């Protein structure tokens, strides 16, 4: 079976493969981040989002993998074989878990569309020959200049006043928002 854990989120294993392995923080750092930012949602019996569910599953898989690693460490007598198993788990499984954790934490933090746009931008950047690309790689925490961040249900503000209307000299009154519109 060819199962891609990112497919339902609009990404793919191939898209994440453009990011170098040292790009991803350690599992410990990612688990600490997930706990600090999303502990309540992850521990809640309520369903939040598919990203929360996938993050829960990745955390549970890592826990099971660590249980297996402890068992191997305690029960495998041959040190060379034990080292092979530990190195394989850290190199292959560790990277996959780090990618999964990073992807879902980033989607929850920055939004799925921003993360997907970042992955595509980075993929284009890394495949462009060095002589023809900007010196710095795209950065996820920097929103693209074209992104407009505003509350739902409000019309975009004009940047300049209409030439037909004079600006009032008195300060503008702010409309109070209803509690329902703050979600």
From Swiss-Prot:
Residue numbers carrying Phosphoserine: 162, 170
Region described as 3 X 8 AA repeats of S-P-R-R-R-[PR]-S-Q: spans on this chain: 155-177
Gene3D superfamilies cross-referenced by the UniProt entry: Viral capsid, core domain supefamily, Hepatitis B virus (1.10.4090.10)
Biological process terms in GO annotation: microtubule-dependent intracellular transport of viral material towards nucleus; symbiont entry into host cell; viral penetration into host nucleus
Pfam family, one: Hepatitis_core
Residue numbers covered by motif Bipartite nuclear localization signal: 158-175
Repeat region (Sequence), residues: 155-161, 162-169, 170-177
Recorded superkingdom: Viruses
Biased composition (Basic residues): 151-176
Processing after translation: Phosphorylated by host SRPK1, SRPK2, and maybe protein kinase C or GAPDH. Phosphorylation is critical for pregenomic RNA packaging. Protein kinase C phosphorylation is stimulated by HBx protein and may play a role in transport of the viral genome to the nucleus at the late step during the viral replication cycle.
Subcellular location: Virion; Host cytoplasm
Record-level GO cellular component terms: host cell; host cell cytoplasm; T=4 icosahedral viral capsid
Disordered: annotated segments: 136-183
Alphabetized GO MF terms: DNA binding; RNA binding; structural molecule activity
Keyword entries, A-Z: Capsid protein, Cytoplasmic inwards viral transport, DNA-binding, Host cytoplasm, Host-virus interaction, Microtubular inwards viral transport, Phosphoprotein, Repeat, RNA-binding, T=4 icosahedral capsid protein, Viral penetration into host nucleus, Virion, Virus entry into host cell
InterPro entries, sorted: Hepatitis_core, Viral_capsid_core_dom_sf_HBV
Main location group: virion
Free-text function comment from the UniProt entry: Self assembles to form an icosahedral capsid. Most capsids appear to be large particles with an icosahedral symmetry of T=4 and consist of 240 copies of capsid protein, though a fraction forms smaller T=3 particles consisting of 180 capsid proteins. Entering capsids are transported along microtubules to the nucleus. Phosphorylation of the capsid is thought to induce exposure of nuclear localization signal in the C-terminal portion of the capsid protein that allows binding to the nuclear pore complex via the importin (karyopherin-) alpha and beta.
Family: Belongs to the orthohepadnavirus core antigen family.
Subunit structure, interactors included: Homodimerizes, then multimerizes. Interacts with cytosol exposed regions of viral L glycoprotein present in the reticulum-to-Golgi compartment. Interacts with human FLNB. Phosphorylated form interacts with host importin alpha; this interaction depends on the exposure of the NLS, which itself depends upon genome maturation and/or phosphorylation of the capsid protein. Interacts with host NUP153.
Name this polypeptide is given: Capsid protein
